[in-house]
Amino acid sequence: MQKIIGRVSRRVWNLAGEVMHYRKPDLSKAGYVRAFPHQHVVETVRHQLSKSRPLSGTGVIKDDYLDVAEGIARFFAKYQRETGEIIDPIDQIEHQYSTPCFALLVALLHKHDRAPDLIGYAWNALLAASNAICHTRAAENHGDFYLFNLVQALDILQEIYPSDIRIGVAEGRIRKVIATDAYRCLLTPQRRRLDNWNVIASCGEVLREQAGLGNGGFHDRHLEQQLLHFTEDGMYVDPKSPMIYDLYSRFFLEVTLQGQYAGRHRDAINLMLERGAYMSLLMQSPAGVAPSGGEAKQHTWADIQQIPVFEIAARRCESRGDYVYAKAFKRGAHLAFASTIRWMRTSGDLHVVKNHMHPENRHGYESYSHHSQYSLLSAIMLALAADFSDESIDEGPTPCEAGSYTLDIPAFHKVIANHHGTGIVIDTKAETRYDGTGLLRVHQAGGDPILGPNDVPPADDYPMNIGVAWREFPGGDWVHLASHGQHTDIKTKLAASDSSDGIRTITMVYTIPSSGHTITERYELALTGVNVSINVDGAVDALTLTYPCHVSDGKLFPQILIEGTVLQMSIDGTMRTFSIISPGAAPLAIQGEKVAYRNGYVQCVTSTIPGRAIQYSLMEGSLSALAGFGVGRVVNQLSNNI
C-alpha cells in the first residue's frame, strides 16, 4: 500500500509540473526562426562538389550495415536470460536499454530476411522490456529510452505475425505506460532544462501515438520546449555542449519523422534536422569521422550515428533533385561505416570506445558506458540505416574530400575546417575536464585517423594539444594555451578565413586579459597537410611546443622515429610527419611516461624555442596505396628506418 501511495503521489507531482505549471516557451529567438548562418557554405560547397572529379568508390553497400548489425545481435543473443532480458557479458547485469534495443535490432534484421533463428529471442526481449516499462521497472531507471525501440519492434513483428497472441500482450503493456511514472527527464517546477533523454522519450511517445497506443499531450509539450535547444545551425545543444549528443538527439528525431510524425512542431523540427544534416556532413573529417569533444567523446557510435542520418538526408536531397548533395550524403554514410570497421571485435561485437583494450578494462569509458547497451545502440543505428538506404543513389565527392571551407560553431566552441582532403578541429575554449583549448585534431584522406592526432587527454590532467606553452622568465612555470578553458577569462575569435592559391588560411586569436597575453595562430591547409605559425605577445621568455604522440591503441603500436626536430610515425602502411620549421628549436624529446587517453596511450613530445614565435608542419606520408576510400598521398621519400 505504501508503494502505491508513493507512486500516486509522484504521479500527481509530475502532472502538476507537466500541466498546471507548464509555461509555453518563448520561441521568438529559437533557432528555426533565424537564418541559417552557414547557408553560404552549403551553396559554395555544392558548386565545388559539382566541379570535382569522380573519386574511387568505397565499395560499401547496405548489406555491410546488416552484416555488422547481425554479428552484434548474434553475440548478445548468447547473453539473454530465459525471461528475455539481455545481460551484459562484462558486468553480468542488465544495463539501461539493452533489452528493448535487442528487440528492435532482431525485428529489423528479420524484416530484411536476416537471422530468422533469432526471432524467438526478439519476442522474449519485447515482452520482458514491455513488462518492465509498464511496471516502471526499466533497467537502471532508463525508461525514457524504451518506447522508441519497443513500438518500432512491435510494428515490425505485427506486420510479419499479425495473428500472434503476443502482439496483444505487448500492446496492452505499452498502452498502460504512464509517461510521468516511466520517465526521468520531465518538465517540472524544479526542472526547466531538458536534455537528450527527453528527446528520446518524446520520440517514443510520438511513435506510440502513431501506433494508436497513446496520445500526443506529452510529446507536444516537451518537443516545443526542445526547440529552444537547437541553434540556428540545426544543432542540438545538450548541457555542457558535448559534440556527440548533438547528432545523437537528431538521430532519434530523424527516425521519428520518417514515421510520418504530423505534430504541431513538425515543420520547425524538420527545418532544424535539414540544417543539422548539412552541418554534420560539413563537419565530417576526410577519414569519415564525426567531430569529437566533451563528454562521451571517442565512442564508436559517434561515427555510426552519421550513417542513418546521412542515408535519410541522401533520400531527402534526391527527392528534391539535389543530386550533388544526395550523392555526397550517400558517400558520407559509407565513409563513416568504413571508419568504424577497425573497431570490430573478432567475436562479432564492437568496441565501445575507439581503442582495442579489453572491455573489462573500461578504457576511455564514461561511468554510464557499458558494452551491452552501446554495442546494441550501434547495431540499431546500422540496421535502421539499411532500412533507410536507397541503393539507387550513387556516391559522389563529399565536402571534406573535395570542398574548401571553414565552420565557426560558437555553441560548441569549435572551429572546423576542411580543404580537399585535409581537415582540422580547433577547440576555442575547451571543457578542460575532457579536452584542451587549441588544435585538437588533424585528419587527411587516406591516412590513419588515430595518428592524426585524433584526440588529446584532458588538459586538467595533461595539457597536450598540438600547441604552445610559454614562460615569462627563465626558470618560470610553463603556461599552456590548452589549459585556458571554460573556467578562465580567455577570449577567442576566428579572425580570418580564406582560400587562395590552393591553400585555405585560418587565423585564430586568443586573448587572456588576466595575464596580458595574446596568442595568434595561422593555419595553412594544403593537399599535403597543415603548416602552422604561432606568435605569443606579452611577457614571454621562451616557448614550448607540445605534440600528443599516439603510442598504442591496445593492439597496434606505431613505429616512431625522432631525428632532431622531425617526428615520424607509421602504422599499417601510413605515415605521419611532424616537423618544427623554426630555426633555433631544440631537438624534439619524449617527456614522461605514456598517458592513458580515449584511443589508448599517448606520450608528450616537446621542443623549446627561444623568443615568441614558432612554426611547424604536419604532413601525411603514405608507404603504400590504401584500398577503399579517399586519396592516398606520398609526400616524399621518408626515412627507411621507419
Roles of regions detected by a PLM:
Residues 4-123:
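Low-complexity, Ser/Thr/Pro/Gly-enriched N-terminal "stalk/linker" regions
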Residues 7, 11, 15-18, 22, ...:
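Surface-exposed polar/charged interaction patches
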Residues 45-57, 449-459, 627-629:
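Acidic Ser/Thr/Pro-rich low-complexity disordered segments
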Residues 77-272, 284-308:
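Aromatic-lined, polymer-binding surfaces characteristic
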Residues 126, 174-178, 273-280, 329, ...:
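Short amphipathic alpha-helical coiled-coil/interface segments
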Residues 236, 415-419, 503-511, 567-569, ...:
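Generic recognition of long tandem-repeat/solenoid scaffolds
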Residues 282-587:
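Extended polysaccharide-engagement surfaces of secreted carbohydrate-active enzymes
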Residues 579-642:
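Beta-strand-rich recognition/accessory modules
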